[in-house]
Amino acid sequence: MHFMKKYLLPILVLFLAYYYYSTKEEFRPEMLQGKKVIVTGASKGIGREMAYHLSEMGAHVVLTARSEEGLQKVASRCLELGAASAHYIAGTMEDMTFAEQFVLKAGKLMGGLDMLILNHITYTSMNFFRDEIHALRKAMEVNFISYVVMSVAALPMLKQSNGSIVVVSSIAGKMAHPLVASYSASKFALDGFFSSLRREHGVTNVNVSITLCVLGLINTETAMKATSGVFNAPASPKEECALEIIKGGALRQEEVYYDSWSWTPILLGNPGRKIMEFLSMKSFTFDKLISS
């Protein structure tokens, strides 16, 4: 108790004051002008809206999704909105070779890469988990493993540009929900992996930011179909959600919260976890690993 009063509580107060009241840089659309950006899951929903916002800001975009017809329409609209360039490559993120090669091809098309926005998912219906190991494996591969594969492929280019990785996740990856066990597992995996990778970047002085976007229910066709009749909550607009994701990536924020409930970022932002992460870093010795 004495330790808490003397040390832990003052640290907590200082941390909270800094976290909630520190001056943050304001977003400006010019931040994306001429930037080279990959957007996955871009044929519809949040991905499509991000592609449109980026185009209005004058970015170069390379888009991917499974639907070539959908991508063609989105890319054409991107050029109309003012994209510096707009390309697309259709394919499935179940194929890890495609995931890797897409990033490399996109980099060649744009002559580099400034921002990798990972937004794709495999469709998962809401139901009780019983023995659907195949569905669990597919969710982990598409929603998580492919994100890692693409990040690994993109890192050499992002290191050159001091760029950003933007990972679109979910509240289901921060707190337990029923009926979405496989989906939730893949989203928790994103938080664990990319939050750890962010800490490693800090230790090794890699100037590539990682932004985890924690979303509530968004009014995309896929989400509305999946939740119909089993989950009743107000859905937030995909257009505004897409813009908040881009802002968070451009400002190099660690996390972005977007949900209809205003208390979500306060309750899930979890300053206690951040304090524990900060304190735990003092237990590691990295010299041997860095020099090897």
Swiss-Prot record:
Catalysis performed (reactions): an 11beta-hydroxysteroid + NADP(+) = an 11-oxosteroid + NADPH + H(+); corticosterone + NADP(+) = 11-dehydrocorticosterone + NADPH + H(+); a 7beta-hydroxysteroid + NADP(+) = a 7-oxosteroid + NADPH + H(+); 7-oxocholesterol + NADPH + H(+) = 7beta-hydroxycholesterol + NADP(+)
Active site: 183 (proton acceptor)
Binding site for substrate: 170
Enzyme class: oxidoreductase
Location relative to the cell: Endoplasmic reticulum membrane
Keywords for this protein: Endoplasmic reticulum, Glycoprotein, Lipid metabolism, Membrane, NADP, Oxidoreductase, Signal-anchor, Steroid metabolism, Transmembrane, Transmembrane helix
E.C. designation(s): 1.1.1.146, 1.1.1.201
Tissue specificity annotation: Detected in adrenal gland, liver, kidney, testis, and at lower levels in brain and lung (at protein level).
Pathway in which this enzyme or protein is active: Steroid metabolism
Matches recorded under CDD domains: 11beta-HSD1_like_SDR_c (cd05332)
Any matching Pfam family: adh_short
Cellular component GO terms held in the UniProt record: endoplasmic reticulum membrane
Glycosylation sites: 162, 207
Ranges annotated as spanning the membrane: 8-24
Source species, domain of life: Eukaryota
Disulfide bonds: none
Membrane association type: Single-pass type II membrane protein
Molecular function as annotated in GO: 11-beta-hydroxysteroid dehydrogenase (NADP+) activity; 7-beta-hydroxysteroid dehydrogenase (NADP+) activity; oxysterol 7-alpha-hydroxylase activity; steroid binding
GO terms of biological process kind: steroid catabolic process
Role according to the record: Controls the reversible conversion of biologically active glucocorticoids such as 11-dehydrocorticosterone to corticosterone in the presence of NADP(H). Participates in the corticosteroid receptor-mediated anti-inflammatory response, as well as metabolic and homeostatic processes. Bidirectional in vitro, predominantly functions as a reductase in vivo, thereby increasing the concentration of active glucocorticoids. It has broad substrate specificity, besides glucocorticoids, it accepts other steroid and sterol substrates.
Family under the similarity heading: Belongs to the short-chain dehydrogenases/reductases (SDR) family.
Quaternary structure and interacting proteins, as annotated: Homodimer.
Protein name: 11-beta-hydroxysteroid dehydrogenase 1
UniProt source species: Mesocricetus auratus (Golden hamster)
Gene designation: HSD11B1
